[in-house]
From Swiss-Prot:
Gene this protein is translated from: btuR
Keyword set includes ATP-binding: yes
One Pfam family here: CobA_CobO_BtuR
Catalysed reactions, as listed in the record: 2 cob(II)yrinate a,c diamide + reduced [electron-transfer flavoprotein] + 2 ATP = 2 adenosylcob(III)yrinate a,c-diamide + 2 triphosphate + oxidized [electron-transfer flavoprotein] + 3 H(+); 2 cob(II)alamin + reduced [electron-transfer flavoprotein] + 2 ATP = 2 adenosylcob(III)alamin + 2 triphosphate + oxidized [electron-transfer flavoprotein] + 3 H(+)
Family of this protein: Belongs to the Cob(I)alamin adenosyltransferase family.
Gene Ontology annotations of biological process type: cobalamin biosynthetic process; porphyrin-containing compound biosynthetic process
Name the UniProt record assigns to this protein: Corrinoid adenosyltransferase CobA
Subunit field text: Homodimer.
Length: 196
């Protein structure tokens, strides 16, 4: 491809991108969902949260399911003023106690509702929320209501597999992560600094 043809092609791309950017003028908080069976949902959420903190935004985090071991995202973000509320019961297949898991979920959800109502928070991460709805630990209607009632500038990031259709419909941005290959399938254990 000649330099002239390359330049013409790139100019067309630039014109299309510039036109789309010019049309997108609304400023408001959005709902982002990272779902699917692939690795990286929580990683994507915390990468976005770190970006927000880097720009001086106030971020709150609620972690469902995870939380019985130290994790890098908390070690990084908490010293920068990010509030973490963690269910801290571990994986539900380990606890095998529906009543206790539901109670723990509801307790940490109270913090989530508080964060979603807080006009000082620019972003709230609800890590692994999808499981809480799927397992009927949290009423879907209560989650939808809290999301709809949040301050207009607040962005919410929801992670987890099998996100309920009503949450997907409410979301502004949905990314579905698909597994292609995973080290765990080859017998490589979860590693600090990579997986947690």
């Amino acid at each position: 491809m000649s330099d002239e043809r390359y330049q013409q092609r790139q100019q067309k791309v630039k014109d299309r991108v510039d036109a789309r950017v010019a049309q997108a003028q609304e400023e408001r908080g959005i709902i982002i969902v990272f779902t699917g069976n692939g690795k990286g949902k929580t990683t994507a959420a915390f990468g976005t949260a770190a970006r927000a903190v880097g720009h001086g935004k106030n971020v709150g985090v609620v972690q469902f399911i995870k939380g019985t071991w130290p994790n890098g995202e908390r070690n990084l973000l908490e010293p920068h003023g990010v509030e973490f509320q963690v269910m801290a019961t571990g994986f539900t297949w380990e606890t095998q106690n529906r009543e206790a898991d539901t109670a723990a979920c509801m307790a940490v959800w109270q913090h989530g509702k508080r964060m979603l109502a807080d006009p000082l928070l620019d972003m709230v991460v609800l890590d692994e929320l999808t499981y809480m709805v799927a397992y009927d630990y949290l009423p879907l209607e209560e989650v939808i209501s809290a999301l709809n009632a949040r301050p207009g500038h607040q962005t919410v990031i929801i992670t987890g597999r099998g996100c309920h259709r009503d949450i997907l419909d409410l979301a502004d941005t949905v990314s579905e992560l698909r597994p292609v290959k995973h080290a765990f399938d080859a017998g490589v254990k979860a590693q600090m600094g990579i997986d947690y």
